[in-house]
Amino acid sequence: MNQKTTPFEKTRPDRVRKQYKKQEEFTLYGWNSCMSAFKARPESLLRVFFSRARSAELKDVKVFCGENKLPYRQLDQESLNKVAAGVHHEGVIMVVKPRLPESAHRLIRGKMSDKGLVVVLDSIDNPHNQGAILRTCAFFGVEGLIIPGNGKASVIPSSAARMAEGGLEAVPVFTSSDLPSALRDCREQGWFVVGADPSAKETLFNAKVKFPAVVVMGNEQEGLSSRVKQKCDMVVRVPGKGSLQSLNVSVAAGIILAEIDRRRKTFKKN
């Protein structure tokens, strides 16, 4: 007896294909984020959309697309806004294969330089803050960024990639489903874990930091979670003199990384 196919069963393969397609594609927009990706990994390019004003500047990209039979198309402003789901695309959008993050264990078990520097984000979900911190990490040569996640999909949204201005291609991103355990493993490897929290008693500029170092940033509302804070060797704050008690987390990250980068240039291991 033939069994009838239900409407759900008919649509399920299409849903699965759409889900896989979504996981296998990542939309970049903004000139620096797009061109950094193209220069770093042109083989990941899938298709390109651009404005008339950007057409001449994208000559090399269009030649590459032609040679590799990849679609590219000039669009008007309204159409570009729809593809990017916003207006901050600067006239260029690239759909690429995503750089899927690896497990933090790979970073922790690997070889870290004596003056290595890693950044960990604890519950920082705002894409603008993620992107700004990623850009700062790239500027100071951070060797890895660890973010909560399971590693099965991209954890950096397109808007964060745009804010990073190419930083996504410069800084390896790793994920951990259990940040306290990852920080414990970092300490077992001899890495010095510094947490940043506005309620800390110790100030950044008085703290004695050792290397390799891990800097942990918490979200602006709650700071570091208690379990994460317990795994830090030291918790510091950026001292201020004004009426406001705290900084935007991406600004605080910039100050902290600048100070720690300054120290690691002259750090001598005992």
Regions found by a protein language model. Give the residues of each.
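Structured adenosyl-cofactor binding patch, chiefly the S-adenosyl-L-methionine
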Residues: 35, 139, 159-167, 226-270
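Short, glycine/polar-rich helix-capping loops at beta-to-alpha or helix-loop-helix junctions
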Residues: 57-58, 152-159, 222-231
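RNA substrate-binding interface of SAM-dependent RNA methyltransferases
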Residues: 43, 50, 60, 66, ...
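Short, hinge-like loop/turn segments at secondary-structure boundaries
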Residues: 90-93, 162-166, 210-214
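Short beta->alpha connector loops at strand-helix junctions that form conserved
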Residues: 76, 97, 122, 148-149, ...
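Active-site/ligand-binding-proximal alpha/beta "capping" segment
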Residues: 194-248
